[in-house]
Amino acid sequence: GAGKTTLLNAIAATIDPSERIITVEDAAELQFPHAHVVRLEARPASAEGVGELTIRALIRNALRMRPDRLVVGEVRGDEALDLVQALNTGHRGCLSTVHANGPVDVLRRLETLALLGGAGLPLDAIRTQIAAALDVIVHVERGLDGKRRVSQIAEVVGPCEVKALMAVPC
């Protein structure tokens, strides 16, 4: 891949060791050196159709565990709505990854995924919530030479609007 999880692990390593971190993942990939990490992992239903633990359910439960930081390994479905709502209820300094072609596309992708959440929220409300929830987007990609690098860092300044803080051609 482009190195999203590797970068997420590197950024998380800079978090104060005294902070309580709750990680939510589909498959355990995050490796944090902190003492206060609670790892939650999704699982499919059994052959009998019971026991499923979704990312959405895990995000909701993580908030009850009083995290200083919530880290969602990858947002790829309707859990985007739960993550955005969590970020807008005082859970700041959270981290996650999402597949997108650039910072503006991150906002659009989160909109689409949040709409899948089925809360019946109008698009304008979702856009406003996303803009309020996100501070900075770091975009990584694999260059033409095959090397992974941070290609853009952007500040979210409004719904569907980012301000480039750094851009490097790949």
Residue ranges and their predicted role:
Residues 1:
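Walker A (P-loop) phosphate-binding loop of P-loop NTPases
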Residues 4:
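Conserved lysine of the Walker
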Residues 9-60, 106-110:
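P-loop NTPase switch/communication element
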Residues 25, 30-35, 62-159:
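Conserved P-loop NTPase nucleotide-binding/switch module
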Residues 161-170:
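C-terminal regions of RecA-like/P-loop NTPase motor modules
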